[in-house]
């Protein structure tokens, strides 16, 4: 029987221009399980994903501990991002179950 534990999955949708900034923060907080993909969609201010517009969005999924997930959400929603309000950047979270034997979730860099 597989034993699972609860981890936090943070999903961040961001303007591609913020990629390096967000990736550095994710790594500095110790999250080591993440991936990203290019996405398109519509928000309050624009439709993105037009290959001729030069705009791009990324969807990043991070699976980490509850504590690290909370720190990442706090950072994304902090006042420092008020200066980045013209960029697409939002996040949401849910709980996921991971195999308890998977040490990469709790590994800290």
Predicted features along the sequence, with ranges:
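Positively charged, small/polar-rich N-terminal and surface patches that mediate targeting and assembly
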Residues: 1-109
């Amino acid at each position: 029987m597989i034993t699972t534990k609860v981890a936090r999955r943070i999903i961040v949708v961001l303007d591609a221009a913020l990629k390096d900034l967000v990736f550095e923060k994710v790594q500095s907080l110790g999250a080591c399980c993440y991936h990203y993909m290019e996405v398109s969609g519509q928000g309050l201010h624009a439709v993105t994903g037009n290959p001729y517009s030069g705009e791009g969005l990324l969807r990043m999924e991070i699976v980490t501990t509850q504590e690290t997930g909370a720190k990442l959400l706090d950072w994304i929603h902090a006042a420092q991002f008020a200066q980045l309000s013209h960029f697409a950047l939002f996040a949401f979270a849910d709980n996921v179950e991971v195999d308890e034997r998977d040490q990469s979730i709790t590994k800290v860099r």
